[in-house]
């Protein structure tokens, strides 16, 4: 037999086997994620209000909705319903600060103190761990009296990888934490101002973040408090995260103390030091979201898989991914408290629970799920086979997705409340 004939015969044999195989893929019909009217996704109160309106046509990507907010203070993109709530809630704060910046007292304070935005400080607030090594040469030039405490802060942040996380956390607490409380009055002013405005001091909104920088620096350098009053709070203005406001920690605790608190909590969960370092150093997690993730995970203490969940979170590549994982863990906490206890976290691409009855529990903080190849692959996951499967979504499924999930044996729960009913003191 000629070589070419043998190759052709081998190819045909493989092709026939594939066609006859019971696991051979069959043609499947998928959806193109639609553009939807905004009112089908969110309540009217989030679509228009004092100084803002949301574009009526909202593109979706198969999981999330992408909103455009047009306002008197700029145009903002929100790549999920959660981010829409947050960004809409920040607009009154931006408007209030705009108004206050024109007041006589503020203008005089700026003139006397030549207060300017602090670029390095603003970066540190948004990504505290990622930029802490640049503190003495960055923010340090504005606060010359940091002195020895500032040098120890740098040492704590640049400790060799082999140093125990507990040792680094303790040193960080006794040096950097005290320095932040006593010397970084700027940071304290920023948190206090954010609390007055009911916004996240670690917001990634560039407009609001810059305003918080300007006002906090003015108040710190002029020794004059900035007082604001928001007359109208739009729905969602307290939505620092989709799951719940992170108690009052993000407002009342110095940044360094929050970092140490998170480190210690992860150590108590027996997360390896190298994983803690990778997670704490991931710049896509705003400190508020990082704190929420750790707080939620702590409520699942003792359940196998928590370490793997932190490992996965350390690989998040965007704020949207960070919030998704944080909210998913928060929803698992709610299920654990109100439905059936979770006995294990299954961490393979996502953070999924298995409850005491053996059911697979998928908590999905998504907006609108279309039946795409990606969603189909997830719904057909072989490691879910043989178990009762439930999926809980904060948003909704397309009709095709709903039908296909149910046909595959999934129990579907849509538009669930993601807020865990937990005691903040736990």
Where do the language-model regions lie?
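Amphipathic interfacial helices
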Residues: 95-148, 171-234
